[in-house]
């Protein structure tokens, strides 16, 4: 990877994305009501966001860019086309609009949330900081262990990859949130909620894992499908059907995301992963309702079963496509390149 060239391309991609988001902010002046005209005006930006990440070849720049633009930003723009979603608030400032469009963030703008924010204690904030630092140390430890990967059993490497994927995703999204918070000075909803503490699949996917993706899937898929199904089926099947569709859409979008990482035809394994979890989550909900008050697993047991199921199925269906195309090795190899480049630049700035 040519670092200077990749960083230059990265800058060009994001300058283009910011310019496109500025254009989107003023589309309502031409099409004040959501509908076909606004959708037509936004489609060029949707297409631009699809093609921009193809210019990047590195995992650590191309991956987040594809997630932010191709999936999250485009889904927000499609909602915006019909005057729905987080971008439809006419009081958003230009900077607020751009940040909401391009970054995986959601601002706390409810007065009750402001009151809640004021009630937070300093010790609680410090606990969050200490926990995040611990995650950074753990992440660095995983990278160090990779130096001995040739001597490690396959299942150990799969476990490391699962932790790597989680920690890398949370750290990357947290960096985006820090930029938005520093720029706008506003409080944000959390992007992850300690998914390793989940006690059920519903808890894991609905309340703990990648909450920005869950939120946008709820607005674009789950809620509309549930409204349609509510006319034809009972509540239990309405919820289960909408959930399964949302998981399927998530799987398809992960296939798209994986294409940007591998530049290879989809294998549909990752779609299978999310369809499987959609079915299992729906079954879990039905079973929990059927045995409510009769059977209750200890939190430690249900937590271990939940996280274990996610990791085992992840190693079976989620990771193989990335490993098959060498994305894992490419990702690992980029860390020393980034470290050496950053070290060189810092030493240059300090005159050493």
Swiss-Prot record:
Q: What does this protein do?
A: Catalyzes the final step in the synthesis of long-chain linear esters (waxes). Has activity with both saturated and monounsaturated acyl-CoA ranging from 14 to 24 carbons in length, but C20:1 acyl-CoA is the preferred substrate.
Name of this chain's protein = Long-chain-alcohol O-fatty-acyltransferase
> What is the E.C. number?
2.3.1.75
Q: Which reaction does it catalyse?
A: a long chain fatty alcohol + a fatty acyl-CoA = a wax ester + CoA
Main location per UniProt?
Answer: membrane
Which family does the record assign? Belongs to the wax synthase family.
Q: What class of enzyme is it?
A: transferase
User: What biological processes does GO assign it?
Assistant: lipid metabolic process
One Gene Ontology term of the molecular function aspect: long-chain-alcohol O-fatty-acyltransferase activity
As for subcellular location, the record says:
Microsome membrane
What are the record keywords, sorted?
Acyltransferase, Endoplasmic reticulum, Lipid biosynthesis, Lipid metabolism, Membrane, Microsome, Transferase, Transmembrane, Transmembrane helix
- Topology in the lipid bilayer: Multi-pass membrane protein
């Amino acid at each position: 990877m040519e670092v200077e060239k990749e960083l230059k391309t990265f800058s060009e991609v994001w300058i283009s994305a910011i310019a496109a988001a500025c254009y989107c902010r003023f589309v309502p002046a031409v099409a004040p009501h959501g509908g076909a005209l606004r959708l037509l005006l936004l489609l060029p930006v949707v297409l631009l966001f699809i093609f921009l990440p193809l210019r990047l070849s590195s995992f650590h720049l191309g991956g987040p860019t594809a997630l932010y633009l191709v999936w999250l930003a485009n889904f927000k723009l499609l909602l915006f086309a019909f005057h729905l979603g987080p971008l439809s608030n006419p009081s958003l400032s230009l900077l607020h609009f751009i940040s909401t469009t391009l970054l995986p963030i959601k601002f706390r703008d409810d007065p009750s949330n402001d009151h809640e924010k004021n009630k937070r204690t300093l010790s609680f904030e410090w606990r969050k900081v200490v926990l995040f630092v611990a995650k950074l140390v753990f992440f660095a430890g995983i990278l160090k262990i990779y130096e001995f990967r040739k001597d490690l059993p396959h299942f150990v490497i799969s476990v490391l990859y699962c932790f790597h994927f989680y920690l890398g995703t949370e750290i990357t999204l947290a960096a985006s949130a820090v930029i938005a918070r520093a720029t706008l000075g506003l409080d944000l909803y959390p992007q992850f909620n300690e998914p390793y503490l989940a006690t059920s699949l519903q808890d894991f996917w609905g309340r703990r894992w990648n909450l920005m993706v869950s939120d946008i899937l709820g607005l674009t898929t789950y809620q509309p499908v549930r409204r349609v199904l509510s006319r034809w089926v009972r509540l239990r099947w309405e919820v289960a059907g909408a959930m399964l569709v949302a998981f399927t859409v998530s799987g398809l979008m992960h296939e798209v995301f994986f294409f940007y990482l591998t530049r290879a035809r989809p294998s549909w394994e990752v779609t299978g992963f999310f369809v499987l979890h959609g079915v299992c989550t729906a079954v879990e909900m039905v079973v929990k309702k059927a045995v409510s008050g009769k059977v209750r697993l200890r939190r430690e047991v249900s937590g271990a079963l939940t996280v274990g199921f996610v990791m085992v199925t992840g190693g079976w269906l989620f990771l193989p496509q990335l490993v098959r195309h060498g994305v894992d090795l490419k990702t690992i190899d980029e860390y020393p390149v980034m470290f050496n480049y950053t070290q060189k630049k810092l030493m240059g700035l300090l005159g050493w």
